Regions:
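Sec-exported extracytoplasmic/periplasmic mature domains
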Residues: 29-32, 106, 116-120, 170
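Short Gly/Thr-rich strand-loop-strand
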Residues: 108-147
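A short, solvent-exposed beta-edge/loop patch
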Residues: 90-91, 100-102, 133-171
């Protein structure tokens, strides 16, 4: 009985952990999956990524790129989250960012503030530069969903992508 109980509690906890990378992948367009990698933090504390151009990197290079380029864009500090998956465009001519963040205890507002700051910086950089990209940034959404995650969607068709993510998180 002890083995069965420990086995079932193990599977219950793994069932509770959601695959944020897969949820983002399924919520967005095929084109975004082709061009924009989705990154997260691996068990070993290094950043990993799938999709987009992630296959072009060696593991350490990829982890460094995410740590030095992508995470500062999002404004997420290590102590702010328990888990996350995100995808942002590093191109200055394209507004693109999606993220699912499971905040650390007591850090929900910090995560919301970081996501809001990302969206505001995208709006500001595009306001007098590329009107179509400014419209995308202006339609961005940051919200804490009923399951507790903070979701940021700053991309084309943001309402649909947001609803797809919200539904998948609730499943």
């Amino acid at each position: 009985v002890g083995c069965g109980a420990s086995g079932s509690s193990g599977s219950a906890s793994s069932a509770a952990k959601k695959d944020y990378t897969q949820i983002l992948h399924d919520a967005r367009s095929d084109e975004d999956n082709e061009y924009e990698m989705i990154f997260t933090k691996g068990e070993d504390g290094k950043f990993t990524a799938q999709y987009g151009y992630s296959a072009e990197y060696e593991a350490d290079q990829l982890s460094d790129e995410v740590a030095n380029m992508m995470m500062p864009l999002l404004g997420l500090e290590d102590d702010m989250y328990d888990d996350f998956a995100a995808s942002v465009s590093g191109m200055m001519v394209r507004v693109y960012g999606v993220a699912i963040v499971k905040p650390a205890e007591g850090k929900t507002q910090d995560v919301v503030d970081a996501m809001d700051a990302y969206v505001q910086s995208q709006q500001k950089s595009m306001e007098h530069y590329l009107e179509d990209q400014y419209q995308i940034a202006s339609a961005a959404r940051v919200a804490t969903v009923p399951t507790g995650e903070v979701v940021m969607v700053c991309c084309e068709d943001s309402d649909t992508v947001f609803e797809n993510i919200k539904k998948a998180l609730a499943a």
